[in-house]
């Protein structure tokens, strides 16, 4: 069985995606929070990862890409997985 990520990238809208297998259960509140985050000004893409779960207002286990605007509330308290700056 050949595995590749493209098989598991699922578009939920033009700006919202998840990366998850068919067998992975994701809480509906986390999906709702992805859509809420995607509606923020200048937010271009929101992607829920396999560890996606609801947070306090915004989802945890997701990647966010915005242009011209930085959202400090999107930074986790421990800074895990943050990349702030130009994309390489």
UniProtKB/Swiss-Prot annotation:
Xref: SUPFAM superfamilies: Hypothetical protein PH1602
InterPro entries xrefs: RtcB-like_sf (IPR036025)
GO terms of biological process kind: RNA processing
UniProt-recorded name of the protein: Uncharacterized protein YkfJ
Species annotation: Escherichia coli O157:H7
Gene that produces this protein: ykfJ
């Amino acid at each position: 069985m050949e595995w590749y990520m493209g098989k598991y990238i699922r578009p939920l809208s033009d700006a919202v995606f998840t990366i998850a297998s068919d067998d992975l259960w994701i809480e509906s509140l986390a999906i709702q929070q992805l859509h809420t985050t995607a509606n923020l000004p200048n937010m271009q893409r929101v992607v829920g990862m396999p560890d996606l779960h609801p947070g306090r207002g915004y989802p945890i286990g997701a990647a966010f890409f915005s242009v011209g605007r930085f959202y400090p509330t999107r930074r986790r308290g421990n800074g895990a997985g943050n990349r702030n700056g130009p994309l390489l």
